From Swiss-Prot:
Residues 81-84 are annotated as: G3. Residues 10-204 form the tr-type G domain. This is Elongation factor Tu. Residues 60-64 are annotated as: G2.
Length: 394
């Protein structure tokens, strides 16, 4: 039997639930699917179906993640929910599930907790553009004044991390009561869904962003010239376009004279395509794996940056011991390993396996990176951590 076809008749958005353990993230995810299933826009997923998340591997790291999909009248949503706190940290840092927006779930009965803060900080550092708040368990804390205080605390915390705390929509409800079919609380879940549709803009599609393709391989075709192959990360490219070769060496411009996929000429290549690009006036030794082809001026080479990283535990196949400033692992960006030196920040003296830390990294060679670029940290070919560039320093 053929797979069901994915019909692209609505804008697509990636969302996820974030927040402290036991504040109701998974229950809310189940409630959203149940409420939408009554309108024929989702398959209802029970709590234990979502909680029993399969393991996935991303950048050499195992992460438990549940993917749920649903539609509204306006959009198609892919919703990610992680069972454990460590899974959230790993998921957000590796970019395993890129979020266009997050639903921050805070228990009205408990208010802000340590992971509430940590997830907001992570959302800021990995570049989640929008957050909406669902104040959950309001049935357990019916005192209006207490809920007002909790809401104020959440808004202040969001502002502290540069989200527009005063303007972010806060919906009060009870995911459990909504699941049980209580009409008042079902209405609150509907309000949350409507807020997702209206408060979050359609994301700029990858194909509309400036062209970028990491170079995976380079070879010469006799009589035609040098071809570089790779997967287009974003944007589009066609024969006649001017591009820059960025990273590792001096940036240089060239013209793409042909684009091919599976030995056939393409009118244009776009995000997601695996292609070969024929370059004018470029020799085999002028370009190498680890560089990128990009729209001129859209990306610059950098060698120093601040990063947010997650360090694997021994059980996850990571280091058995802590590391300190001057640690020199390899940083794997897109298609290549580059050695770099780590400096720990603030009063942090060492980073232990399992830690989530902020580091300053100086690479031996400059490469094409931007805020939000993801990388792995490797030692002797095995992954010991994952990171995301949070700020460029040169």
């Amino acid at each position: 039997m053929a797979n069901e076809k994915f019909i692209r008749n609505k804008p697509h958005l990636n969302v996820g639930t974030i927040g402290h353990v036991d504040h109701g993230k998974t229950t809310l995810t189940a409630a959203i699917t149940q409420v939408l299933s009554t309108r024929g826009l989702a398959k209802s997923r029970a709590y234990d179906q979502i909680d029993n998340a399969p393991e996935e591997r991303e950048r050499g790291i195992t992460i438990k993640t549940s993917h749920v999909e649903y539609e509204t009248e306006k959009r198609h949503y892919a919703h990610v929910d992680c069972p454990g706190h460590a899974d959230y940290v790993k998921n957000m840092i590796t970019g395993a599930a890129q979020m266009d927006a997050a639903i921050l779930v805070v228990s009205g009965a408990d208010s802000v907790m340590p992971q509430t803060r940590e997830h907001i900080l992570l959302a800021r550092q990995v570049g989640v553009p929008k957050i909406v708040v669902f104040l959950n368990k309001c049935d357990l804390s019916p005192d209006e004044q207490i809920l007002e205080l909790v809401e104020m605390e959440v808004r202040e915390l969001l502002s502290q991390y540069d989200f527009p705390g005063d303007d972010i929509p806060v919906i009060r409800g009870s995911a459990l009561k909504a699941l049980e079919g209580d009409a008042h609380y079902v209405a609150q879940v509907n309000e949350l869904i409507e807020t997702l549709d209206t408060y979050i803009e359609d994301p700029v599609r990858e194909v509309d962003k400036p062209f970028l393709m990491p170079v995976e391989d380079v070879f010469t075709i006799t009589g035609r010239g040098t071809v570089v192959t790779g997967r287009v990360e974003r944007g589009q490219v066609k024969a006649g376009d001017e591009v820059e070769i960025v990273g590792l060496k001096e940036t240089r411009k060239t013209i793409v004279t042909a684009v091919e996929m599976f030995k056939k000429d393409l009118d244009f290549a776009q995000a997601g395509d695996n292609v070969g690009a024929l370059l004018r006036g470029i020799n085999r030794e002028d370009v190498q794996r680890g560089q990128v082809l990009a729209k001129p001026g859209s990306v610059k080479p950098h060698s120093k940056f601040v990063a947010q990283v997650y360090v694997l535990t021994k059980e996850e196949g990571g280091r058995h011991t802590a590391f300190f400033s001057q640690y020199r692992p390899q940083f794997y960006f897109r298609t290549t390993d580059i050695t770099g030196v780590v400096e720990l920040q603030g009063d942090v003296k060492m980073v232990m396996p399992g830690d989530n830390a902020e580091l300053v990294v100086t690479l031996n060679n400059p490469i094409a990176i931007e805020e939000g670029t993801k990388f792995s940290i490797r030692e002797g070919g095995k992954t010991v951590g994952a990171g995301s560039v949070s700020k460029l320093l040169n």
